């Protein structure tokens, strides 16, 4: 009889160490991978002073960016543009989604000084728009909602003219309590990603629930009808176009007005493989459908991510 795997608190488990403990065994690290089409090949710019400045500023304050932790392909572009998505509540997630490159494990307690550190870093960077996200923290009674609220409060106190978007987890089992915590310090944009279609949730988002995520988006909108709600999807994981269109309609039916749609990219051989690469023309068609459905803004393209050019998304600019 094998000995149960025991995680050490504060240790990051990645790649095989992370995906090997997922209940649904659907990853063969030795399988042949799809070849990337030409439209998915980008030339990364050389590291610049601005990129290093952002990285050093975050490390100096003990902060994390989802750009680095999730191995985002747009990191160089966004950092060169002077933007970053801050990841609060540590860099260890209590979930182990096999599409995501963020580390899994037993996280450390939240840093009570993080809200102030975050506010000072944003002030130093002279940002006008910021996205704040987090790992899942199922170990916390409020799932981290109170910490989100404190971060928004601290950032606004030092940066009174800034626009704040929060990209939140699903606050599993604690939606009512979480939204109550956010009432005191609401964001300018509320974002929660559905990620993909409900048929694939068991293998893509173990521990999550499609209807629960819709409920979170709907109930936030009911409390704050004038704050835009936003959600993002990845394509290329085995879903059909018809299923994606149905998810888009579900989002509209629950009051969501902003959409992001991008191509899934496999972080490593130990993550879910890409089932297909969606051509740019299909992303254009998805954007047209989104406009027909009544989304106020839809960013659809191979390299689009939830917080990619979020400032342009919020102002209605074309992002693809």
From Swiss-Prot:
GO molecular function, one term: 4 iron, 4 sulfur cluster binding
Residues that bind [4Fe-4S] cluster 2: 93, 97, 100
Compartment list: Cytoplasm
Location, primary (coarse class): cytoplasm
Residues that coordinate or bind [4Fe-4S] cluster 1: 67, 72, 78, 307
Domain Radical SAM core positions: 79-296
Pathway(s): Protein modification; protein lipoylation via endogenous pathway; protein N(6)-(lipoyl)lysine from octanoyl-[acyl-carrier-protein]: step 2/2
Co-factor: note: Binds 2 [4Fe-4S] clusters per subunit. One cluster is coordinated with 3 cysteines and an exchangeable S-adenosyl-L-methionine.
UniProt KW keywords: 4Fe-4S, Cytoplasm, Iron, Iron-sulfur, Metal-binding, S-adenosyl-L-methionine, Transferase
One GO cellular component, as annotated: cytoplasm
SMART domains: Elp3
Known catalytic reactions: [[Fe-S] cluster scaffold protein carrying a second [4Fe-4S](2+) cluster] + N(6)-octanoyl-L-lysyl-[protein] + 2 oxidized [2Fe-2S]-[ferredoxin] + 2 S-adenosyl-L-methionine + 4 H(+) = [[Fe-S] cluster scaffold protein] + N(6)-[(R)-dihydrolipoyl]-L-lysyl-[protein] + 4 Fe(3+) + 2 hydrogen sulfide + 2 5'-deoxyadenosine + 2 L-methionine + 2 reduced [2Fe-2S]-[ferredoxin]
Entry-linked PROSITE patterns: RADICAL_SAM
The enzyme's E.C. designation: 2.8.1.8
NCBIfam families, A to Z: lipA (TIGR00510), PRK05481.1 (NF004019), PRK12928.1 (NF009544)
PANTHER family reported in the protein's UniProt record: LIPOYL SYNTHASE, LIPOYL SYNTHASE, MITOCHONDRIAL
Record family assignment: Belongs to the radical SAM superfamily. Lipoyl synthase family.
Name recorded for this polypeptide: Lipoyl synthase
Originating gene: lipA
């Amino acid at each position: 009889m094998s000995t149960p795997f025991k995680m050490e608190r504060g240790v990051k488990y990645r790649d095989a160490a992370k995906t090997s403990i997922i209940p649904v065994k659907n990853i063969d690290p030795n399988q042949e991978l799809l070849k990337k089409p030409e439209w998915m090949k980008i030339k990364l710019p050389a590291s610049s002073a601005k990129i290093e400045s952002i990285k050093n500023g975050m490390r100096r304050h003990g902060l994390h960016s989802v750009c680095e932790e999730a191995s985002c392909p747009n990191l160089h572009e966004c950092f060169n543009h002077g933007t970053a998505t801050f990841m609060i509540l540590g860099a260890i997630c209590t979930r182990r989604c096999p599409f995501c490159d963020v580390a899994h494990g037993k996280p450390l307690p939240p840093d009570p000084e993080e809200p102030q550190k975050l506010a000072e870093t944003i002030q130093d960077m002279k940002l006008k728009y910021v996205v704040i996200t987090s790992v899942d923290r199922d170990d916390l009674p409020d799932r981290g909602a109170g910490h989100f609220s404190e971060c928004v409060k601290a950032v606004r106190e030092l940066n009174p003219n800034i626009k704040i978007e929060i990209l939140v987890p699903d606050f599993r089992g604690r939606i009512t309590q979480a939204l109550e915590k956010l009432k005191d310090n609401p964001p300018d944009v509320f974002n929660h990603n559905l990620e993909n279609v409900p048929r694939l949730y068991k293998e893509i988002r173990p521990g999550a629930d499609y209807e629960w995520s819709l409920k979170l988006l709907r109930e936030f909108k009911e409390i704050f009808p004038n704050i835009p709600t936003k959600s993002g999807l990845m394509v290329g994981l085995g879903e059909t176009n018809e299923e994606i269109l149905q998810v888009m309609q579900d989002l509209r039916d629950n009051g969501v007005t902003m959409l992001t749609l991008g191509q899934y990219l496999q972080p490593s051989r130990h993550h879910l493989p890409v089932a297909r690469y969606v051509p740019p023309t299909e992303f254009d068609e998805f954007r047209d459908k989104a406009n027909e459905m009544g989304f106020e803004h839809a960013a659809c393209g191979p390299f689009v991510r939830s917080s990619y050019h979020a400032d342009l998304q919020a102002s209605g600019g074309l992002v693809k």
